[in-house]
Amino acid sequence: MDAQLTLDFGPPPPPCFDNFVAGANLECLATLRHLVYSLKRGETPAQRFFYVWGPAGSGKSHLAGALTASQCPNLMVVDDVDRYSKGRQRTLFHRFNALIDQPDHALVVFGNQPPARLKLLPELVSRLSWGMVFSLQPLDDNALADALEQSARERGLNLGQDLSTYLLRHTRRDMASLKTILDGLDRL
């Protein structure tokens, strides 16, 4: 029996604002898009400091990747601040203070808890509360199905509604887990 050849469609597209399924997080998405737009135009944004938090699978790393991919030199992006060592926390605190005097720069920090519940240096927690704070909400069933089908289409796969429904009923319901399943399907 001949071995089945696998088709390599390549890696999935990198995270960007256009392939982020916002669901109830539209305000956060629009605000971060506008931030990048303002910075790229050389404008001083009305708000320069942001803290975005949410549970695993809510889209934090996707948005952090989209901000990084925007290649905006005046934008500092920090993901998983909740995992920072004390030394990295101090460095971030000092960097935050330095950015205060740079009106054409912005900082977006992502974590898994609201600022007041983070186990970080108190002075850093205080700074994270200064700007806009967004709580990312997990996608509801319809938005999760849309995100799953969109991610599959980007890989050249057509799941169909029946398979999407099956996956949502019988697997973990976060995008990271669902994308891992899509990776497996893509390799078949």
Per-region residue spans from a language model:
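Dynamic helix-loop-helix/coil hinge segments at AAA+ ATPase domain boundaries and subdomain interfaces
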Residues: L7-L29, Y166
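Phosphate-binding P-loop
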Residues: G23, H34-Q47
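Walker A/P-loop nucleotide-binding motif
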Residues: T44-H62
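Conserved P-loop NTPase "ATPase switch" module shared by AAA+ and STAND
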Residues: C72-A98, A106-Q113
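Conserved AAA+ ATPase "SRH/arginine-finger" region at the nucleotide-binding site
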Residues: G131-A143
